[in-house]
Amino acid sequence: MQDNALLKQALKHPLYEKIQKLNLKVQNSNYTIDDSFNIFCDEKLDEEIKNIALELKPWRKGPFKINKLFIDTEWQSFIKFNILKPYMQEIKGKVVADIGCNNGYYMFKMLEFNPSKLIGFDPSIKYFLQFFLLNSLAKTPIQYELLGVADVPNYGIKFDVIFCLGVIYHRSDPIAMLKQLKQSLNKDGVVFLDTMYIEDEREIALIPQKTYSKIPNIFFIPSILGLRNWCYRAGFSEFEVITTRQTDFEEQRKTQWIDSYSLDQFLDKNDSNLTCEGYEAPKRVYVKLKV
């Protein structure tokens, strides 16, 4: 891990010490991968693991199983992963980054496709600690850096494949972010990206006045042609639309593993095709980019 201020904060977090102590007690562990990432370890640790996991709420991406404990996360993230699964053969033997990796769910899922290196980037201490708990039990070779997308071009490693899922609409300068992704690629590298989008044939973007689906840090939601033009402006020459999907209550919903609201509270009570602010309800487009 790189030395940075967030990492220093994380290492001083009380839960980091708890997880370190737990890690020393793990004698046998293995994992399997299906829609959830399933960890099997010493059952005598079950109560300790559950207590730490509860302290780490909210759990957004997943799900996970640790022995008999099922962490039923807000997002059924395997739905998004399965959209990209036909492309996962491209990561075999490759150096792969997951930018905005949350707790590492997608990277854990990628292990079965045998990349040579997996590095996640996310500047969230909470998500890092969730990953640290999971990986202390599963003991995979995945690396996690408490860094954001702007840090990746200067990280010191270039990537063959970059996943950047659900990040770009949080950036106030999306073209600059796309340029940072491009700068982080090896020659012939590819980017898989998803974003919320609006249905419009024009080359435009929605700029929410204050919030979108009650989320304050959403800056731009482009049309698909608007997204394409951002990518071209950033220096990408190939723009392939993989698919689109409207976010529904199967994919995102409130569970006991989050304490806040979820999708049902973000939409218009009388029309689920609109957000509570009156904008189009969330839909996502998945794209593959090449330089």
UniProtKB/Swiss-Prot annotation:
Reaction it catalyzes: carboxy-S-adenosyl-L-methionine + 5-hydroxyuridine(34) in tRNA = 5-carboxymethoxyuridine(34) in tRNA + S-adenosyl-L-homocysteine + H(+)
Enzyme Commission numbers on file: 2.5.1.-
Residues that hold carboxy-S-adenosyl-L-methionine according to the record: K61, W75, K80, G100, D122, P123, S124, Y169, R284
Keywords recorded for this protein, A-Z: Transferase, tRNA processing
Pfam family, one: Methyltransf_9
Example of a GO MF term: transferase activity, transferring alkyl or aryl (other than methyl) groups
GO biological process, one term: tRNA wobble uridine modification
Broad class of enzyme this protein falls into: transferase
UniProt keyword Oxidoreductase, yes or no: no
Assembly behavior: Homotetramer.
Function: Catalyzes carboxymethyl transfer from carboxy-S-adenosyl-L-methionine (Cx-SAM) to 5-hydroxyuridine (ho5U) to form 5-carboxymethoxyuridine (cmo5U) at position 34 in tRNAs.
Similarity remark: Belongs to the class I-like SAM-binding methyltransferase superfamily. CmoB family.
Name of the protein described by the UniProt record: tRNA U34 carboxymethyltransferase
Gene this chain is encoded by: cmoB
